[in-house]
Regions:
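TPR alpha-solenoid repeat register
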Residues: 59-62, 96, 130
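Canonical positions in the second alpha-helix
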Residues: 49, 85-86, 119-120
């Protein structure tokens, strides 16, 4: 009996040691992944370590870090759940309450969000972020109840269950779209430790060509074709897409010059993403080259956007000298030296102490961009700003609902000289999965008119007459 008891105790001791070792190993993996910004991988490792841990203080910290990972990868519903659990476990830093409110706002739960922000204000009254967030929730509620004339439609045939984002017109008549995708079939077959999806490629879709019907009947509406890879579309060896991330495309109006982002792996480590350019010759895209900007290689250079006249390159960077985490910068092209000049910050009217991304310069000189620092509905909202007479950009204006939602909305572009039709990216509720591309349309104004048609001479009403009204643009 004594021998059996000793064996049993030894087995239990071994199991406890093995469990502690496994938990410690997972925790170390999670910490390493978190430091490398591999949030999807870190969250999985934290989950495993959490399930094996018996240390309450350690579990509380891991619960908070799991919430942080979910927030960083845009999984707001999961982040909300983890923040709630962390607060219930009596996490001692009230920042968890602020972040819970942010996740509730991102999910459109504005009343719950306001309660969380009010609770945070009681604990940290000197932090103005909660008060600003309450104001934003009130604005958002009003915007949802009073939508603008824009209508937004999910491009279901273009999107996949993976991330699809950042559409860019690639020819003069706006019948081709380049966009970023993480769908099956991309060049790289590995899963990104940061996002949990495939590494992204640049793919293409175009409006199908339809023969017009004779007569005055309703013409069929052309549809966007099934997206295919860049190499397959142009039928050439793809020199643009690699096994790692490419995306955030910007093209010249003629569609023969392309700027895009590329992530480069060196010695098993990703280096800060840079902007590359390539030109199209004889229908084929040439070997891309990194463009030279005066930005230290330790900092990111992303979301490039070429101005319509090709003299300015707008981009986003976390380099020093800005106002927040990521700012919008611009570089002017110098013809004499055939090079881009030193980056110039877009200033405090545009940039905040948070993040600004996806700049887009319209033909009329309006700058469109996304921000989570200006007052918005939640996540990233799309804003616009017009250049003043002094050359600086003026007060930014929120594009409101339904262009914006409580989720992340960014990457807007417009076709033609107006701002009536275009595309944007959003991970809003109701999409196919992750980021989706949406079509944007400005609805026509509708008027209700009534009156009586009378004879000029007699003043008597005229019966049985149909009236046709024609506008200055020929519309009737």
């Amino acid at each position: 009996m004594r021998y059996t008891r000793i064996v049993f105790l030894c087995c239990v001791s071994c199991l406890i040691s093995l469990n502690s070792y496994a938990q410690g190993k997972q925790l170390k993996k999670a910490e390493t992944a978190y430091e490398r910004l591999e949030f999807h991988k870190a969250m999985k490792c934290y989950k495993r370590a959490y399930s094996k841990s018996n240390d309450r203080a350690q579990k509380i910290q891991m619960s908070f870090l799991m919430a942080e990972c979910a927030r960083r990868i845009g999984n707001y519903r999961q982040a909300e759940s983890y923040y709630k659990r962390t607060i219930k476990m009596r996490y001692d830093d009230p920042i968890a309450i602020l972040y819970l409110g942010m996740m509730q706002r991102n999910l459109g739960k504005y009343e719950d969000a306001i309660k969380s922000f009010e609770l945070y204000m009681q604990k940290v009254p000197e932090d103005i972020r909660a008060q600003e967030a309450i104001v934003a929730c009130e604005f958002a509620t009003d915007w949802v109840n009073n939508p603008t004339r824009y209508a937004v439609f999910n491009m279901k045939g273009m999107n996949s269950k993976f991330d699809d984002r950042m559409a860019s017109f690639s020819n003069k008549d706006n019948t081709q779209l380049f966009f970023t995708t993480a769908r099956k079939g991309v060049t790289g077959r590995k899963i990104s430790a940061q996002t949990g999806q495939y590494y992204t490629d640049i793919w293409v879709t175009e409006l199908e060509k339809i023969k017009k019907k004779k007569g005055k009947g309703k013409q069929p509406k052309p549809k966007w074709t099934e997206p295919i890879s860049l190499g397959e579309f142009f039928d050439f060896d793809d020199l643009v897409n690699t096994k790692y991330d490419e995306g955030a495309v910007s093209l010249s109006e003629r569609g023969d010059l392309m700027y895009f982002n590329r992530a480069v792996m060196k010695k098993n480590e990703f280096h800060s993403p840079r902007i590359y350019s390539t030109i199209k010759k004889a229908g084929e895209w040439q070997t891309p080259e990194e463009i030279s900007l005066s930005v230290d290689s330790n900092y990111m250079v992303i979301y490039s956007s070429l101005s319509p006249d090709q003299t300015k390159l707008y981009f986003v960077s976390d380099m020093p000298g800005g106002y927040g985490n990521f700012d919008i910068w611009v570089s002017n092209y110098d013809k004499k030296s055939d090079a881009w000049g030193d980056p110039i910050n877009m200033g405090p009217e545009v940039n905040t102490d948070a993040m600004e991304i996806s700049p887009y310069m319209h033909k009329d000189g309006t700058l469109f961009f996304a921000s989570n620092g200006h007052i918005g509905m939640g996540g990233f909202d799309i804003f616009r700003s017009v250049m003043r007479s002094d050359g600086q950009y003026g007060k930014v204006k929120n594009m409101k609902y339904p262009i914006n939602s409580s989720y992340d909305d960014f990457g807007i572009i417009f076709s033609g000289k107006d701002v009536m039709n275009g595309f944007l990216t959003s991970n809003r509720k109701g999409g196919r999965g992750g980021d989706d591309i949406y079509e944007v349309k400005l609805s026509d104004l509708k008027f209700a008119m009534e009156g009586v048609l009378v004879d000029d001479e007699t003043g008597q009403p005229i019966q049985g007459v149909s009236i046709n009204l024609e506008g200055s643009d020929g519309a009737s």
